[in-house]
Structure formats: C-alpha cells, structure tokens
C-alpha cells in the first residue's frame, strides 16, 4: 500500500463505456446523501458523435468491458468492498469507442484519443487506459499506424501516462 488513492486525479477509460449507475462507480464516497459522481465526463463517438462536451450523455456501457477496466482502475468496491480499484478516490471519464459487441473502428478509437487530449484540462485527465484487442493481428495501413503513433505521442506529451493493452484472442 503506497498510500496513494487517486484523489484529485481523473483517469480516462477508452473502451466500451462506463456504467455510471454501477454501485462501485457511481460516486466517490458511496454515500447516497452526497452528490459527488465518480464519472465526471463521457464521450460516445460510436452512438452520439455530435455530443462532444462530455456531459450530454449519461455514462453507460452496453458491453461491460469498459466498466470492468474502470472498476480495476478506480472502483470504490461497493457494495461488498471485496474488490477495490487501484485508485478508488480518482474520478473517471468514459470514452466509448467500442460498440455493444466489443467491436470498433479505427475512426472511433482515434476520435476518442483526440477527445481525451482536447479535454484533458476540462476534466483534469492525468492518465488514460485503453485495453483493446481482437481475434487476430491488427493490420494497419501506414497512415493509420502513423495516426496511432501521433495521437499516442500527443497524449503522452500532454502529460497522460497512457496504458495500452492490445490483446489477440
């Protein structure tokens, strides 16, 4: 235990969304008498690409993986407190780049990365997590690979530790 609980920081989860009503992700102190939402922003280029200010869509996850990642990162552990995230006092921003089937396009992933960089000050985003993968090797064009490198570098240069896991299953 390092004593760090994530207080004052926000982590962007770039994935299938975040269930804003989940008991371990709905508020910072798990006290229904206080209004202190844990998920403070949400962008959905999959189903709501024109709603870009981060507060127009209630956070949702129609697949589940993004909520799992959010819980591992910053879940409070409610209701049983058996499994608490690494930074339970951190806020979250959900960036939904994958659909209900867990699939997505290069365009929505790039839109999500760009939105995260563009909104880093508004939401105090200090780190970003992308845990994306698929059934085979990713075959990008050279321009797509250059875009991933450019946006990844932009995120790191903007001060975001970027955790990317690309799994092949």
Please name every model-derived segment.
Residues 5-7, 76-80, 94-169:
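Substrate-binding/access-modulating region of protease and related hydrolase catalytic domains
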């Amino acid at each position: 235990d390092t004593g760090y609980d994530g207080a004052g920081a926000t982590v962007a989860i770039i994935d299938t969304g975040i269930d804003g009503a989940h008991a371990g992700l709905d508020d910072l102190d798990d006290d229904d008498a206080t209004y202190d939402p844990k998920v403070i922003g949400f962008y959905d280029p999959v189903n709501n690409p024109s709603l870009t200010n981060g507060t127009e869509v209630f956070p949702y996850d129609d697949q589940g993986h993004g909520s799992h990642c959010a819980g591992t990162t910053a879940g409070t552990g409610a209701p049983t407190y058996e499994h608490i995230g690494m930074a339970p006092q951190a806020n979250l921003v959900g960036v939904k780049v994958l659909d209900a089937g867990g699939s997505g396009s290069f365009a929505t992933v790039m839109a999500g990365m760009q939105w995260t960089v563009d909104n880093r000050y508004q939401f105090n985003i200090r780190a970003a997590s992308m845990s994306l993968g698929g059934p085979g090797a990713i075959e990008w064009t050279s321009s797509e690979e250059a875009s991933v490198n450019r946006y990844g570098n932009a995120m790191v240069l903007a001060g975001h530790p970027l955790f990317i896991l690309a799994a092949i299953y």
